[in-house]
Amino acid sequence: MKRKICKALICATLATSLWAGASTKVYAWDGKIDGTGTHAMIVTQGVSILENDLSKNEPESVRKNLEILKENMHELQLGSTYPDYDKNAYDLYQDHFWDPDTDNNFSKDNSWYLAYSIPDTGESQIRKFSALARYEWQRGNYKQATFYLGEAMHYFGDIDTPYHPANVTAVDSAGHVKFETFAEERKEQYKINTAGCKTNEDFYADILKNKDFNAWSKEYARGFAKTGKSIYYSHASMSHSWDDWDYAAKVTLANSQKGTAGYIYRFLHDVSEGNDPSVGKNVKELVAYISTSGEKDAGTDDYMYFGIKTKDGKTQEWEMDNPGNDFMTGSKDTYTFKLKDENLKIDDIQNMWIRKRKYTAFPDAYKPENIKIIANGKVVVDKDINEWISGNSTYNIK
């Protein structure tokens, strides 16, 4: 929040100075705001691969949903490039990185990073946007759902690159941008058209075995990220040759396309079968996705909290305070809350609320637009608020 101005300034200084001299493009696979570039190629080929690999035994509902997805292909492409242009994003793209061996992005693992560590990672972003996509799809909002799915696949593509799962940034190596430019310029020759099997064979069949969506998604992503990280050290650093880079781009871009096809296959089965990833699962964490109104002065610098009360009367509350500026007019902010009692089911939570506490004697009013709460890969609360919250106030959302 703005009140933590010192570290915000540190982060801003890093953003302007550490990336200087490398490039203004500090993200992973290239992508343009109009839905073109390497990221868009990956998702487009992912759908094409799945269509080519579809077994004749696939349920009609899956086929129908695949057709709906194809009808919204441009939204998938736009979503796949949007995270690199999102005005709400972290300046250093910290949440686009994920080391599959440490479960961290570079803000926790790299010694040169002196500002706040960022809890979100490329892997957690995949799960968040997949949950939002599934929720909107089941409501019939296919356009928005497909855009969210594209965002999820952006992060999946990021953690398949050699540099992002190795937590090697443009600060650590000039090769970060150079390699991804190399891949972008040659992306057409790295296209694949099949995962090498039909959807009733091992690769796709294994994708459907684990009904715990969060657990499946994390381990599925981990497998591809480990390959990308290994390729960085064996073929993609600045010490490697052009032939090595060609091999690295060929392998990791093929993995991105194949992995995307598999992820979309899981998504289509989940929405076609009405799978509820949260049934019977203990809730270890809650993810809040909060939209602040775009109305003038809707944001706040006051303290903001999220709390729950369980049926046995116990309460837990967390401060919502991301590094830098959050709760700004028109912003969308994400917060992850770890529960003390890991044996809770979602139905054990009786009440949820957000609370505002004055930071100064002259508090801001705050106008949230919407809040969604995600548990175990499912949106369990979707609350339109659109009310001004003034002073020291509590707003119940459940």
Curated annotation (Swiss-Prot):
Location in or out of the cell: Secreted
Zn-dependent PLC domain ranges (all copies): 29-278
Signal found in the keyword field: yes
Uses in industry and biotechnology: Vaccination of mice with a fragment (residues 275-398) protects them against a subsequent challenge with purified alpha-toxin.
Outcome following mutation: residue 2 to E: In strain: CER 89L1216
Residue sites binding Zn(2+) 2 per the record: 164, 176, 180
Mutagenesis or variant effect for residue 47 to I: In strain: L9 and KZ1340
GO biological process, one term: killing of cells of another organism
Record note on what altering residue 329 to A does: In strain: 8-6
Keyword field: Calcium, Cytolysis, Hemolysis, Hydrolase, Metal-binding, Secreted, Signal, Toxin, Virulence, Zinc
Entries under Gene3D superfamilies matching the protein: P1 Nuclease, PLAT/LH2 domain
Effect of residue 180 to Q: Loss of all enzyme activities
Amino acids binding Zn(2+) 1: 29, 39, 158
Chain intervals for the UniProt region annotation (Linker): 275-283
Residues that hold Ca(2+) 3 according to the record: 300-301, 325-326
Impact noted for substituting residue 303 to F/N: Increased dependence of PLC on Ca(2+). Dramatically decreases hemolytic, cytotoxic and myotoxic activities
Job of this protein: Bacterial hemolysins are exotoxins that attack blood cell membranes and cause cell rupture. Constitutes an essential virulence factor in gas gangrene. Binds to eukaryotic membranes where it hydrolyzes both phosphatidylcholine and sphingomyelin. The diacylglycerol produced can activate both the arachidonic acid pathway, leading to modulation of the inflammatory response cascade and thrombosis, and protein kinase C, leading to activation of eukaryotic phospholipases and further membrane damage. Acts on human and mouse erythrocytes, but not on rabbit or horse erythrocytes.
Assigned protein family: Belongs to the bacterial zinc-metallophospholipase C family.
Domain comment, as recorded: The protein is composed of 2 domains; the N-terminal domain contains the phospholipase C active site (PLC), in a cleft which is also occupied by the 3 zinc ions. The C-terminal domain is a putative phospholipid-recognition domain, which shows structural homology with phospholipid-binding C2-like domains from a range of eukaryotic proteins. The ability to bind membrane phospholipids in a Ca(2+) dependent manner and toxicity is conferred by this C-terminal domain, which also contributes to the sphingomyelinase activity.
Protein name: Phospholipase C
